[in-house]
Design a protein with these regions (language model features):
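Active-site loop ensemble at the mouth of alpha/beta enzyme cores that anchors a bound cofactor
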Residues: 423-445
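Hard-cation-handling environments
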Residues: 355-430
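Conserved small/polar residues in nucleotide/adenosyl-binding loops
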Residues: 459-461
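Flexible glycine/proline-enriched surface loops and loop-helix/loop-strand junctions
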Residues: 314, 383-388, 440-443
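Acidic, metal/ion-coordinating pockets
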Residues: 2-13, 18, 23-352, 359-360, ...
Length: 461
């Protein structure tokens, strides 16, 4: 791996951003320079920044992109359902470059050893502060796409309080959720009260009164432009997770409700309408073709990292990856109350290149201090690459299932095909932190039951 000093010589990040083609070209020669990192086609009066699916990760991580990402029907063979060489070709990314490493599994291990980990919220903070400085603080809106509070040892021990504290320090201005609901309704409400910004979601209704549980929309003025942010929580939460955790609440996509909320926002003077969504990429692609009046969809849930926004009719759709690996950015120009131009990019947060923000580092260290000894406790070493991410299982799932078979004396073991969970390279130590990045949840029970072959054949994960 390049040394920190070499990386800093290659790139200082006083501000940042890289337009895909220009950065890709210089990266092929391994000559990243400051001007390349600063290169972004800034436009208009407004900048949207998007973080999503961080799954409790405060520190830099390895996170291997998928080996499979199957699309169904008309979604087959198009983003985000492209992997490896097909992904590189579609987005005009040269192999063996930083972008190729950030976005595909091609030659993942040697490239990971060269370019290092990505993410770490203190490194992301450096980028956010640089963009705010570049654009002007009054033009930037930072939004959180959910699945933020769950997924690590510290998030489990603090029941989400660690991530709430950090996201407040980042000056986040709105969020939506999914795994946030698995803390239970009482804890969810406690954490929402501590946020200091709205937990938006117009698609969750009280089953007794058939009324919205959360506010649907928040208005912001940035760069003299009125922006409406409409929230969409994960619509299948009671199916994907235990329904008792959201008792009395009904979830769904609710297209009619969403269209009404968009129309209402327009009538109230919104010049930009943003859907902050945890629907998943394919659902939001379909939604964008059915709902009128949405300018931008910032999508999450499926962990797809798309290098730039994809336009569907009049809507720009951006998916900003997961685990803190990326920061999404969209600039918008508004004229006569309408969006007339946009520029978008997904910024890989290379932690060996981007210096950490000292204040955020101090906060993260303070949060982790009571748990540091246990987090760092080594329980083994991996001989092979351990990862999760695809539609089905990864090698971490194999380890978990093999362990359950051995410890619970079973013939078959089943594990949900989660997409969250960080990666370990061959030869790395396995720590408690690593184990909890795969297993941290508020309903961790393992059940041993008898099943017939017919029952097994009916299971869909």
């Amino acid at each position: 791996m390049r040394s920190r000093r070499e990386f800093i010589q290659l790139a200082s990040v006083s501000a940042m951003l890289l337009a895909t083609k220009s950065w890709n070209a210089v990266a092929a020669k391994q000559k990243l320079k400051t001007e390349d990192l600063l290169d972004f086609d800034s436009k208009g009066q407004v900048t949207l920044l998007h973080l999503t699916d961080m799954h409790g990760q405060l520190k830099p991580v390895y996170f291997r992109p998928p080996s499979e990402n199957f699309g169904v029907g008309k979604f087959e063979g198009i983003p985000p359902h492209l992997i490896g060489e097909a992904f590189l070709k579609h987005f005009d990314i040269l192999p063996n470059t930083p972008l190729a490493y950030a976005h595909t599994m091609v030659d993942y291990v040697p490239l990971a050893m060269e370019y290092g980990k990505l993410g770490g919220l203190d490194h992301t903070t450096t980028l956010i502060k640089a963009i705010r400085s570049e654009r002007g603080d009054d033009k930037v809106l930072l939004l959180d796409g959910g699945d933020t509070w769950q997924g690590s040892y510290t998030s489990l021990q603090t029941q989400g309080a660690d991530m709430v504290e950090v996201m407040r320090a980042l000056r986040t201005e709105a969020m939506v959720g999914h795994w946030e609901f698995t803390f239970g309704q009482d804890r969810l409400k406690e954490l929402i009260d501590k946020l200091g910004y709205p937990f938006l979601g117009g698609n969750v209704f009280d089953t007794e009164w058939d009324e919205p549980v959360f506010e649907s929309t928040a208005f912001f003025e940035k760069g003299g432009v009125s922006i409406a942010v409409i929230g969409q929580h994960f619509p299948y939460t009671p199916i994907a997770n235990p329904s008792y955790m959201v008792k009395g609440w009904s979830f769904g996509i609710r297209l009619e409700v969403l269209q009404k909320n968009v129309n209402k926002a327009k009538k109230q003077g919104a010049e930009i309408v943003v859907l902050l969504s945890h629907n998943g990429f394919d659902v939001d692609q379909k939604l964008a073709s059915m709902i009128d009046g949405i300018d931008v969809i910032l999508t999450g849930h499926t962990h797809d990292a798309i290098p730039k926004g994809i336009r569907i009719k009049d809507t720009l759709l951006l998916s900003s990856g997961s685990h803190g690996k990326y920061l999404g950015r969209i600039d918008l120009k508004v004229k006569n109350g309408k969006v007339v131009d946009t520029s978008s990019n997904l910024i890989p947060v290379f932690s060996d290149i981007i210096p950490p923000d000292p204040d955020m580092t101090k906060l993260i260290n303070k949060i982790r201090a009571p748990y540091q000894s246990e987090c760092n406790r080594v329980i083994g070493e991996t001989e092979t690459l351990l990862y999760r991410r695809g539609n089905f299982n990864g090698s971490w799932d194999d380890v978990i299932c093999d362990t359950i078979i051995r410890e619970r004396d079973t013939e078959i073991s089943l594990s949900p095909g989660f997409r969250w969970g960080t990666t370990l390279l061959p030869g790395q130590k396995i720590t408690i932190d690593d184990i909890y990045s795969q297993t941290s949840m508020n309903y961790p029970e393992v059940y041993r039951i008898e099943m017939t072959g017919k029952m097994l054949s009916l299971i869909h994960i």
